[in-house]
């Protein structure tokens, strides 16, 4: 009888544990069902990265003095600085500079500590490739400026906060019956119309 009661007690505990596990999972599901959809139709729509977004590193060869500060402050000693000493001028001559973005953690230390500001973080995040060796950028590839989301004619830029009603900063506070993030509210349309008309007016272009 004692063994039977122990089995029943163990079965009840396991049933309660399974029920709690199921409740936790469904509570998350139902919580998201009440939220506003924020689907972005990538790659035809892209969210504009934040002002301090840490994307692909941009490098200016002419500013670099081959001091190797970026190598010393990098947690994984990633940047490869190839230089030779000029015996006549007694100064370093930079030959090549490369960064492997397959290993880079985008911490931004190299940008922060660079004495000549030859390194900067860009908004580019589309670095996917079939061959990981293509992620090893030399000074020529690092020197290319990426296409900005707002200037790319093939992409519709999305400013996430601009799609929310006035005074609302959290998309979860908006009713699910309202328009999705991909549609502009009337207030933003009214704000954009004067600028669009100015750009399309030839008289305004001539005056400028």
UniProtKB/Swiss-Prot annotation:
Enzyme class of the recorded protein, top EC level: translocase
Q: Which reaction does it catalyse?
A: a plastoquinone + NADH + (n+1) H(+)(in) = a plastoquinol + NAD(+) + n H(+)(out); a plastoquinone + NADPH + (n+1) H(+)(in) = a plastoquinol + NADP(+) + n H(+)(out)
Gene Ontology biological process terms in this record? photosynthesis, light reaction
> How does the record say this protein sits in the membrane?
Peripheral membrane protein
The record's annotation in PROSITE patterns points to: 4FE4S_FER_1, 4FE4S_FER_2
Q: How is the cofactor bound?
A: Binds 2 [4Fe-4S] clusters per subunit.
Please give the chief subcellular localization of this protein.
Answer: membrane
Q: Where in the cell is it found?
A: Cellular thylakoid membrane
**Superkingdom of source:** Bacteria
Q: Which InterPro entries match?
A: 4Fe4S_Fe-S-bd, 4Fe4S_Fe_S_CS, NADH_quinone_OxRdtase_chainI, NDHI
Would you identify the family this protein belongs to, as annotated? Belongs to the complex I 23 kDa subunit family.
- Listed PANTHER family: NAD(P)H-QUINONE OXIDOREDUCTASE SUBUNIT I, CHLOROPLASTIC (PTHR47275:SF1)
Q: Which HAMAP family match?
A: NDH1_NuoI
By its UniProt entry, which NCBIfam families does this protein fall under? ndhI, NuoI, PRK05888.1-3
Q: What do we know about how this protein assembles, alone or with others?
A: NDH-1 is composed of at least 11 different subunits.
Explain the purpose of this protein.
NDH-1 shuttles electrons from an unknown electron donor, via FMN and iron-sulfur (Fe-S) centers, to quinones in the respiratory and/or the photosynthetic chain. The immediate electron acceptor for the enzyme in this species is believed to be plastoquinone. Couples the redox reaction to proton translocation, and thus conserves the redox energy in a proton gradient.
This chain's protein is named NAD(P)H-quinone oxidoreductase subunit I
What is this organism's lineage? Bacteria, Bacillati, Cyanobacteriota, Cyanophyceae, Synechococcales
Q: Which gene encodes it?
A: ndhI
């Amino acid at each position: 009888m004692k063994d039977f009661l122990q089995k029943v007690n163990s079965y009840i505990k396991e049933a309660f544990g399974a029920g709690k596990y199921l409740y936790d999972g469904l509570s998350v599901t139902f919580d998201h069902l009440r939220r506003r959809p924020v689907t972005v139709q990538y790659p035809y729509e892209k969210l504009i990265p934040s002002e301090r977004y840490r994307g692909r590193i941009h490098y200016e060869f002419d500013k670099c003095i081959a001091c190797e500060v970026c190598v010393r402050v990098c947690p994984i000693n990633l940047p490869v600085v190839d230089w030779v000493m000029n015996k006549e001028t007694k100064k370093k001559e930079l030959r090549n500079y490369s960064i492997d973005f397959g290993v880079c953690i985008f911490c931004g230390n190299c940008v922060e500590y660079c004495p000549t500001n030859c390194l900067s973080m860009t908004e580019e995040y589309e670095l996917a490739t079939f061959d990981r060796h293509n992620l090893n950028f030399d000074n020529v590839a690092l020197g290319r400026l990426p296409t900005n989301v707002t200037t790319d004619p093939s992409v519709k830029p999305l400013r996430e906060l601009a799609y929310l009603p006035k005074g609302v900063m959290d998309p979860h506070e908006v009713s699910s019956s309202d328009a999705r993030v991909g549609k502009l509210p009337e207030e933003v349309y009214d704000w954009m119309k004067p600028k669009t008309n100015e750009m399309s007016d030839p008289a305004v272009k001539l005056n400028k």
